[in-house]
């Protein structure tokens, strides 16, 4: 629902350092810059380990997407896994399972599909209004390129949330969401509807 209001910036951080970065940005934007915006941050009570903050991720956190960990060197296929919020732990678990099958994984954290969509729409508008100039790339395109590497985005939200950015994703983009919201009383029960 938060994505339907253009004055709302909706966030779904997975880790404490993402939350801290978003709060710091939000305070600056609302207080120091006096912007008429609301920051809606989904914060969960699920207990899981918090890793240290990687270097040079602030821009990606605020833009909505950053690479948490690159694929290990080696042979075999690569997949890009995108997670947000507490389901990131299952993304990290999936990496180990995929390694058993010889599949290497890049791990990406999506802190805001709404911000990614906002950027994509702004770039599309600029390109439409400036047909005589070289086309710009949106942030997703600059990060993920035009690769044939499969991308799987998983979310504890309905699949419609990560699907908001499908237009700017490379071709091999699949979305898995927990569309059983309202039919469950716990996160584990919610994930029974994961598809």
Feature-to-residue mapping (PLM):
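Ferredoxin-type iron-sulfur electron-transfer modules in oxidoreductases and energy-metabolism complexes
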Residues: 15
